[in-house]
Amino acid sequence: MPTINQLIRKRRKSSLARKKSPALQKCPQKRGVCLQVKTKTPKKPNSALRKVAWVRLSNGQEVIAYIGGEGHNLQEHSIVLIQGGRVKDLPGVRYHIVRGTLDCAAVKNRKQSRSRYGAKRPK
């Protein structure tokens, strides 16, 4: 344990909280280009093939982003918009691709939670 004099000479350093989505640089969304589109398997109790994309952002950083919804039209060189939001059972995936913007099409035949998947109101 430090003495009073040691604390006067050098203060205790307060630990900074880790940022949840540092690549966005305090922006709500960022644009990027898909480098590759693949599937990843989730952590232990779950089993699936989750669709993810490696994206190079407009600030030069590369991140892994999750493609939500059933089916997608993304491929290499697609321009996408990403936002923060991790996927709990995929380590390293801290961003989501916004559906229905830029090159990413909306989810077809979506009736509920449409705004999350860029789907228009059915007639």
UniProtKB/Swiss-Prot annotation:
GO MF annotations, alphabetized: rRNA binding; structural constituent of ribosome; tRNA binding
CDD domains, alphabetized: Ribosomal_S12 (cd03368)
Keywords from the named record: Methylation, Ribonucleoprotein, Ribosomal protein, RNA-binding, rRNA-binding, tRNA-binding
Biased composition, class Basic residues, residue ranges: 8-21
Disordered, as annotated region: 1-25
GO biological process, one term: translation
Record PTM 3-methylthioaspartic acid, positions in chain: D89
PROSITE patterns listed in its UniProt record: RIBOSOMAL_S12
Taxonomy, superkingdom: Bacteria
NCBIfam families named among the record's database cross-references: rpsL_bact
Function: With S4 and S5 plays an important role in translational accuracy. Interacts with and stabilizes bases of the 16S rRNA that are involved in tRNA selection in the A site and with the mRNA backbone. Located at the interface of the 30S and 50S subunits, it traverses the body of the 30S subunit contacting proteins on the other side and probably holding the rRNA structure together. The combined cluster of proteins S8, S12 and S17 appears to hold together the shoulder and platform of the 30S subunit.
Sequence similarity: Belongs to the universal ribosomal protein uS12 family.
Protein name according to UniProt: Small ribosomal subunit protein uS12
Organism per entry: Chlamydia pneumoniae (Chlamydophila pneumoniae)
Lineage start: Bacteria, Pseudomonadati, Chlamydiota, Chlamydiia, Chlamydiales
